[in-house]
From Swiss-Prot:
<dbReference type="InterPro" id="IPR007169">
    <property type="entry name" value="RemA-like"/>
</dbReference>
<dbReference type="Pfam" id="PF04025">
    <property type="entry name" value="RemA-like"/>
</dbReference>
<comment type="similarity">
    <text>Belongs to the RemA family.</text>
</comment>
<protein>
    <recommendedName>
        <fullName>Putative regulatory protein Tmel_0100</fullName>
    </recommendedName>
</protein>
């Protein structure tokens, strides 16, 4: 259960739809990026900067981000813990 996650430059994604956050340097991921571009499933959120992370969604969309994978993963965990805290407060009241 995740909320919206900031992936840089004011771009946010639905955290629940992301399957993987990976480093873009390997040849298979470069091919994956090119295939997504050909299929019209590539979303470039880098604003012209170097791609540092590739996010893979459950709909097979490929999202490029200029933020490091580790930073995005930390934002996922922060979002998860914030939602868990809110749910716990609701449970205590109810």
């Amino acid at each position: 259960m995740f909320g919206l996650i900031n992936i840089g430059f004011g771009n946010v994604i639905a955290g629940d739809r992301i399957v993987a956050i990976v480093n873009p340097e390997s040849a298979p991921l470069k091919r994956l990026k090119e295939d997504a571009k050909e299929e019209g499933k590539l979303i470039d959120a880098t604003y012209g900067r170097k791609t540092r992370a590739i996010l893979i969604s459950d709909s097979n969309h490929i999202i490029l981000s200029a933020i490091q994978p580790e930073t995005i993963a930390q934002r996922f965990m922060q979002s998860f813990f914030e939602i868990e805290e809110q749910l716990e407060r609701i449970r205590r009241k109810g």
